[in-house]
Amino acid sequence: MLFNSIDFAIFLPVVFFLYWFVVNKNLQLQNFLLLVASYVFYGWWDWRFLSLIAFSTLVDYSLGVLLGKEEKESKRKVYLWTSIIVNLGFLGFFKYYNFFVESFVDAFTFFGQEIEIGTLNIILPVGISFYTFQTLSYTIDVYKRNLEPTKKFIAFAAFVSFFPQLVAGPIERASNLLPQILKKRSFNYCEAKDGLRLMLWGLFKKVVIADSLSPIVNDIFSNYSTLSSPVLIMGAIFFAFQIYGDFSGYSDIAIGTAKLFGIELMSNFKFPYFSKNIGEFWRRWHISLSTWFRDYLYIPLGGSRGSKLKGIRNVFAIFIVSGFWHGANWTFIFWGLFHALLFLPSFILGTNRKYVEIAKSGFNIVTAIKNVYRTVLTFALVTVGWVFFRAETISDAFTYLKRIVTVFSVGDYSHPNGYRLIDYLLLLLFFVAYEYIIRNKERNPISFKNKYVRLLVYILLVFLMLLFYDDGVDRSFIYFQF
């Protein structure tokens, strides 16, 4: 079920009404309703995969209880590794089996040996990478004794499958979400209003930014071999904003929807394209994933402690695994490697957080000019990375970038929908300018004290959504494939 669908527009008010007006006196019934609603929401895509999430829930709930009772460290490790193997085993089979088989065959072919290993027709369960990491964080935290295991199965199952963030995040920690599900909740009018505003802002980013750019991005990346440098540059920039509008829009809708049920999810984006270096970008982009890898991979590997060589190893590990998490394709692995290489200089020189401190020290014209330069440079480098993320193969990505620096002819490009590149550029300039104005309001981007300003913003956003809505565009979210 898509957030931007008629189905969800009917589903959400029904669940909201039942939650606050029918079962509001009983916490257990509220949690049971959330669980049922979440399974209906997830089963809307393919009901067969409900058994997968149910099994994962049952396994990690049981192992959490066992970890809470067991004092012997050797047995506790067995329980932890059982959780890791089961969860990553499912993820590996459904998401990476064919990739490993094809890569294995290609490796033998490269060395002149022909072998035949059949691939399987595997359907990737929606959101498996997200809920796998969410439930894994629970068993890891219980193992580390950072979290008390819950004995309330319905509440735990609702935590794993909470529908607003189930299929594309934010990837919640049990330490944040589970206590909220376990405690009594009361309706908060102000929070609900904030939630609706966030949902409106997220829908605007999805419909007006992401969906309107989607056809032209698809067209440019499909026909890049015939296009000139200016058009290819625009294609890369447009994809940068498409994926940002798509993914951050989903996160805004998810966070806003959760607010309607009295639950606060973590921020997932903090205006990442205003970052002044790659380290800052990753503190602002997909925060729930980057902090997950930091806490459960980077720090256990040693983080920045120890020798520089080990620190560099850990940096490469976290970025490459992050790339691989996104998809079973060498393009994603290369994208992760590319970001590791971009991050490495500031890591080695110890300047990762330098510009954050400079920004806090007050306004200075020279510093401001330097920060603009750093922001533009960081965005340009991130956009180069997005070419690898979007391309079908690494070879396609390199050819795309090669044409940018070698084919300089200027031609008028117009997409069949009637809009010109300049129309999209003006749209993005408006969007960037507005985001800059609200950059300190990431939890409430369209809330203004003046009610007339608020009303004007609401009307403008709805008008633009109606103007740019295209029924022929694929309305699914990009990160559903991950």
Predicted regions span which residues?
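Membrane-embedded transmembrane alpha-helical bundles that form the catalytic cores
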Residues: 1-431, 436-481
